[in-house]
Amino acid sequence: MNKSNIIMIGMPSSGKTTVGKLLSHKTGKSFLDTDHIIQSKTGLSPKDYVSAHGLDSFLETQQNVILDLAVENSIIATGGGVIYNAEAMEHLKGIGIVIYLKTDFEILESRVSKDRKLARKDGKSFYDTYLERIPLYEKYSDITVECGEKLSSHIAEEILSIIQQG
């Protein structure tokens, strides 16, 4: 399998799904969201799955969904916690270009609704989770895009430009 996929990683509310859909529209590639795949397989949203079965079970389900991905020419938006699973990340790196949507904490905090349940380890705060994940996103990404206050359409154009430059 070639690396024809574009895989989006980043914190919750960093724009993975929004930018991914824009990239899908611009490139004609299919769009997949691993959280939506999990929901269709389990009948539960990631939030409800974590509440019912716990974070470890969710991360295992997420890993299985990702390891089962055998797609080409697709844009794949992943759950924010995917970087906790080395095997899943190595699989993603093997099937595509991994793009990290790096977004400042203050921007993320303003986007995340207060009642949104995030896949946090050991009851950590959103900020602690953010700090913990940054080195993992950087470790696994092929390309990092500094999102700042950029419009999603500009981020998508920047990603396409970087990929086309090769």
Task: State the predicted function of each range.
Residues 1-3, 22, 26, 72, ...:
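NTP-dependent small-molecule kinase module
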Residues 8:
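Hydrophobic anchor at the beta1->P-loop junction of P-loop NTPases
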Residues 11:
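P-loop (Walker A) phosphate-binding loop of NTP-binding proteins
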Residues 14:
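ATP-binding Walker
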Residues 17:
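Walker A/P-loop
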Residues 36-82, 86-93:
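ATP-dependent small-molecule kinase phosphotransfer cores
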Residues 95-135:
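A glycine- and Lys/Arg-enriched "phosphate-lid" helix/loop adjacent to the NTP-binding pocket
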